[in-house]
């Protein structure tokens, strides 16, 4: 497998392919490989936006994807955004290269160039690889501010805390019933990756002036958090035994209590300790039930 970081050869192939294809009017490289401040390694994707005269030929036929290598697996997606449909072709090639192609009508790029703010996917970083019609001449430079969490209002902070403690009751109920699957769904997907992750990001942001850009699903938290906080987070992961998951639940609530209390202090908000205490007693009562 080719684990080259800079992808110079692949980028050159994409550029030459676009120059030969009259239907492709502009090509932009976006995301981490176009952001000088973003972490990048051998497994970083290539995010390539193709601005085309007509999307139909590129959407209906996928043979063009093989122009950049032997396709190992691919995934197609499409969505509406800003009144225009865009299409994704996510491709993993046999040499280990992963490219996320986005196919967009060229007129959309002209529209973006006239707006006062870049969309998030361009604000995180972009490089113009091809521009046959000068569509990007007026495009704003990236500010690299997209996806940085904003300072929550007190209502937003309170809502997240309430949801965390509410979800903990589902975990307790399902652990008592010996229902591991729903218990782990609430513990991992909801409490950890949705709620605790966001509180941990707020914790980091509060100490960095709301300027740190987290990665998806908590990427980057290990290096951003104090070692003891990361160690406490590791303690919230459990094996498949019910007892281990009870332990993980209480480890998670203890960590959340500590981090949320710290965030509340930084923001001069009130942490609802009474609710915390009451729900914790409820969880302990469920655990002790016969």
Regions found by a protein language model. Name each.
Residues 3, 67-182, 187-188, 288:
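Conserved NTP/Mg2+-binding pocket subregion across the NTase superfamily
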């Amino acid at each position: 497998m080719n684990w080259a970081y800079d992808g110079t050869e692949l980028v050159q192939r994409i550029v030459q392919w676009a120059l030969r294809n009259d239907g492709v009017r502009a090509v932009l490289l976006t995301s981490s490989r176009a952001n000088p401040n973003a972490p990048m390694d051998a497994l970083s994707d290539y995010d390539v936006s193709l601005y085309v005269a007509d999307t139909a030929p590129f959407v209906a036929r996928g043979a063009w994807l093989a122009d950049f290598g032997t396709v190992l697996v691919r995934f197609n997606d499409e969505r509406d955004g800003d009144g225009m449909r865009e299409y994704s072709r996510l491709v993993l090639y046999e040499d280990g290269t992963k490219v996320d192609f986005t196919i967009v009508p060229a007129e959309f790029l002209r529209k973006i160039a006239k707006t006062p703010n870049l969309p998030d996917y361009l604000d995180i970083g972009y490089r113009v690889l091809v521009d046959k019609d000068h569509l990007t001449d007026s495009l704003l430079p990236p500010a690299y501010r997209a996806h940085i969490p904003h300072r929550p209002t007190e209502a937003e902070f309170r809502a997240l805390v309430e949801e965390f403690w509410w979800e903990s009751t589902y975990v307790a109920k399902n652990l008592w019933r010996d229902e591991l699957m729903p218990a782990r769904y609430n513990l991992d997907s909801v409490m950890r990756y949705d709620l605790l992750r966001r509180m941990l990001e707020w914790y980091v942001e509060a100490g960095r002036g709301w300027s740190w850009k987290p990665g998806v699903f908590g990427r980057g938290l290990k290096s951003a958090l104090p070692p003891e906080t990361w160690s406490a987070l590791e303690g919230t992961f459990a094996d498949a035994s019910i007892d281990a998951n009870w332990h993980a639940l209480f480890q998670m609530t203890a960590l959340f209590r500590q981090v949320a209390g710290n965030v509340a202090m930084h923001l001069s908000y009130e942490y609802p300790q009474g609710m915390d205490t009451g729900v914790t007693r409820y969880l302990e009562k469920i655990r002790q039930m016969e």
